Amino acid sequence: MDSQGRKVVVCDNGTGFVKCGYAGSNFPEHIFPALVGRPIIRSTTKVGNIEIKDLMVGDEASELRSMLEVNYPMENGIVRNWDDMKHLWDYTFGPEKLNIDTRSCKILLTEPPMNPTKNREKIVEVMFETYQFSGVYVAIQAVLTLYAQGLLTGVVVDSGDGVTHICPVYEGFSLPHLTRRLDIAGRDITRYLIKLLLLRGYAFNHSADFETVRMIKEKLCYVGYNIEQEQKLALETTVLVESYTLPDGRIIKVGGERFEAPEALFQPHLINVEGVGVAELLFNTIQAADIDTRSEFYKHIVLSGGSTMYPGLPSRLERELKQLYLERVLKGDVEKLSKFKIRIEDPPRRKHMVFLGGAVLADIMKDKDNFWMTRQEYQEKGVRVLEKLGVTVR
């Protein structure tokens, strides 16, 4: 709460999950899937203790997804379907989740780097016109991640469900000209795992199975440190084989797929995506920065988002960065490699890093009125109020 007794809400709308709660808290109050579903056929009115409605959102939609036509309002971190997005926000602020009177609250929202201006304008418009929040602030996700880590300068590798961003931040300001985006993230890895399991003879082709495979991925997948070695183990031994019990009681065996699926992050061609993988993209981003800032960036690489949770990811990133630095900067001179300092921070709570940073920032700002865009300012200026965030509005 701020000094006037208004609640300060923090809402991190991801492509896959919504994380929402209050300023100053150290964990989201609610985490639920960012999906909206509509029944395919209305034959029953109840499944278990869930009532089937014309519009199902979040947890309920996820549980009944086999009976629904499901839509994710966000794609690659950007809102694609505003009507469904409003349903998602109604659910977030309504009695099912936060249960707040939006007119007497302030809200801090997060946005991906390189978010189109139109997208940001529309979000502010909806927050003031539909929900009538008293104050709104929009923060860039990568900057919040660094705040949560207690840093002002660093490179954030943020990989969620819909998109992966590599975003350098200097003295608290994100550098859009250096920000890179890779359209491979959690959802693509899950799809690829479905494909790999199909080759093993397990068919997961229904949208309801998607959730099951996501759970298999979270439980069993890891990033291989040395791919040749992993492939040898997968082919010649059964060391990697793990059993997994499906919701219907069947047991499946998963082997080499455990490291093959996340490998798409490093080798996008595996899932027919052009371009370089996450390690090379990170290297290119840092090398494109001003020469004086590079060493700071190499020493403060921060991982964030659910798709950076794979065991083995930090060490593989470090290995590839060292290799690239040796080949392209030192031209193979191994002697000089010992001077190359690199540090990859993988905080244990990185899945909710953006929310945590948002909760910290909102708490610091709660009584500083000059930071927030207010409803009154919006009524006077319209979307030009965004200039207050230091954003140029065309």
Curated annotation (Swiss-Prot):
> Which Pfam families does its entry note?
Actin
Quaternary structure, per UniProt, is: Component of the Arp2/3 complex composed of ACTR2/ARP2, ACTR3/ARP3, ARPC1B/p41-ARC, ARPC2/p34-ARC, ARPC3/p21-ARC, ARPC4/p20-ARC and ARPC5/p16-ARC.
Family per record: Belongs to the actin family. ARP2 subfamily.
Residues binding ATP, per UniProt? G160, D161, G162, R214, M215, I216, K217, E218, G305, G306, S307, T308, M309, Y310
Question: Known Gene3D superfamilies for this protein?
Answer: 3.30.420.40, Actin, Chain A, domain 4 (3.90.640.10)
- Can you name one GO molecular function term for this protein? cytoskeletal protein binding
Instruction: Please cite one Gene Ontology biological process associated with this protein.
Output: meiotic cytokinesis
Q: Which domain of life is it from?
A: Eukaryota
Which Gene Ontology terms of cellular component type are present?
actin cap; Arp2/3 protein complex; cell cortex; cytoplasm; cytosol; lamellipodium; nucleus; podosome core
- List UniProt keywords, sorted A-Z: Acetylation, Actin-binding, ATP-binding, Cell projection, Cytoplasm, Cytoskeleton, Nucleotide-binding, Nucleus
Query: Any idea which residues bear N-acetylmethionine here?
Result: M1
The entry's localization annotation reads: Cytoplasm, Cytoskeleton; Cell projection; Nucleus
Q: Which residues carry this modification: N6-acetyllysine?
A: K299, K322
The organism is: Rattus norvegicus
What task does this protein carry out? Answer: ATP-binding component of the Arp2/3 complex, a multiprotein complex that mediates actin polymerization upon stimulation by nucleation-promoting factor (NPF). The Arp2/3 complex mediates the formation of branched actin networks in the cytoplasm, providing the force for cell motility. Seems to contact the pointed end of the daughter actin filament. In addition to its role in the cytoplasmic cytoskeleton, the Arp2/3 complex also promotes actin polymerization in the nucleus, thereby regulating gene transcription and repair of damaged DNA.
Gene that encodes the chain: Actr2
PANTHER family listed in its UniProt record: ACTIN (PTHR11937)
What is this protein called in UniProt?
Actin-related protein 2
